[in-house]
A protein has these predicted regions:
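N-terminal amphipathic/basic-hydrophobic helices that include classical n-h-c signal peptides
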Residues: 1-16
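Juxtamembrane helix-loop boundaries in multi-pass membrane proteins
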Residues: 17-42, 61, 83-108, 125-128, ...
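Helix-coil boundary and interhelical linker segments in multi-pass alpha-helical membrane proteins
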Residues: 43-57, 111-123, 169-183, 231-242, ...
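Membrane helical hairpin/interfacial module
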Residues: 52-120
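Structural signature of hydrophobic alpha-helical transmembrane segments
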Residues: 59-70, 119-133, 180-193, 240-251, ...
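A generic, well-ordered mixed alpha/beta core segment in the N-terminal half of proteins
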Residues: 107, 111-143
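Alpha-helical transmembrane segments in multipass membrane proteins, preferentially the mid-helix core
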Residues: 138, 171-172, 195-204, 226-235, ...
């Protein structure tokens, strides 16, 4: 259905361009291939325990890659025919952060492709790494000039350009064998997270998010677990004290978000809930390392199952929205 809708956009581009309708695919929707790709990588690490884990990983990886290709094509179309929308998004104090999802998903899809074609994988990972670094250098540095920063800039998506993107670069470079370089990106993401976290949480304490933006609260779950997964990729899966500390803080954030979930979905379930997916998938990924290391094995099994069930529910919500014609913006 998504492919047919995409084809229809091309057939009716003149009519679309003559209206003020928004582009049907928000950049935040890249959270869908992001979550699926990260979950595929988690299942891939279970290959030695379950014979069917590789098959599950491959299916998830193929679906994630297909969705990513579709969204990349749609975004390329947006650049060509909706360039003013792209410009407005880049300069928006909140939405600009979602652009970082493009290089992040490029790296994750590259991680998946590594099992089949290491050369293409390495090219994609380097494109994503250079792309995210270039984007954050250009856009985040603008906030230091004064006069272009707004308080609402420090919302959960603000984690994406400097924190999530650097953690993803770290784990992807570790896959290619560049561990020392990966530690540099891990350090960049970790320090950026430590600096941004109190600012963002203070903003949430003094001003409430509007209902349409509340689903982005799920992004708060990501830094601790994505950081833990990145670190485990760099240190060859050793569950040391730092990983346990990151897990502890990640679960604290999870408990807070579970308490807030009725408020987050007060106006109904929406595609923005995929903001939880990266954190959930990384939680599952790191849980496998805990299980392999004979650390909190009972907890790790529960965490892996919980993460998969939650992402499965996100998939069902997405399918429901597609069947009801409520997926794309109108």
């Amino acid at each position: 259905m998504a492919v047919l809708h995409f084809a229809q956009i091309f057939q009716n581009k003149d009519n679309i361009m003559s209206t003020t309708k928004p582009f049907p695919l928000p950049t935040g929707y890249f959270g869908i291939p992001l979550g699926l790709a990260a979950l595929s990588l988690a299942w891939f690490h279970l290959e030695n325990l379950f014979p069917t884990a590789r098959t599950v990983s491959d299916v998830l990886g193929i679906v994630a890659s297909a969705v990513w290709i579709l969204f990349i094509l749609m975004y390329a179309y947006k650049l060509r025919y909706y360039f003013e929308d792209v410009r407005a998004e880049y300069h928006c104090p909140v939405r600009f952060s979602f652009i970082a999802l493009i290089p992040i998903t490029t790296m994750l899809v590259g991680d998946i492709i590594y099992r089949w074609n290491p050369l293409i994988s390495e090219v994609m990972i380097w494109i994503g790494t250079v792309g995210q670094l270039l984007f954050s250098s250009l856009r985040i540095s603008e906030l230091w000039q004064g006069g272009v920063f707004e308080q609402k800039s420090t919302r959960p998506p603000f984690y994406l350009p400097a924190v999530a993107a650097n953690f993803t670069s770290a784990s992807s470079l570790a896959l290619l064998g560049y561990h020392d370089l990966g530690y540099l990106f891990f350090g960049a993401g970790m320090v950026a997270w430590i600096i941004f976290e109190p600012v963002l949480l203070q903003h949430l304490r003094i001003s409430s998010l509007e209902p349409p933006f509340r689903a982005t609260m799920g992004i708060i779950l990501a830094p601790a677990f994505v950081g833990a997964s990145a670190y485990l990729s760099l240190n060859h899966g050793e569950v040391d004290t730092l990983v346990k500390i990151l897990w502890g803080y990640g679960f604290l954030q999870l408990f807070f978000l579970l308490r807030l979930f009725p408020w987050i979905v007060e106006k109904g379930l929406n595609i923005g809930l995929w903001g939880f997916a990266f954190g959930l998938a990384s939680m599952a990924n790191s849980a496998i390392a805990f299980y392999h290391g004979n650390v909190l094995q009972g907890v790790s099994i529960f965490v892996f199952v919980f993460s998969n069930v939650m992402i499965g529910l996100l998939v069902l919500i997405t399918i429901y929205k597609l069947t009801k014609g409520q997926f794309f913006l109108k």
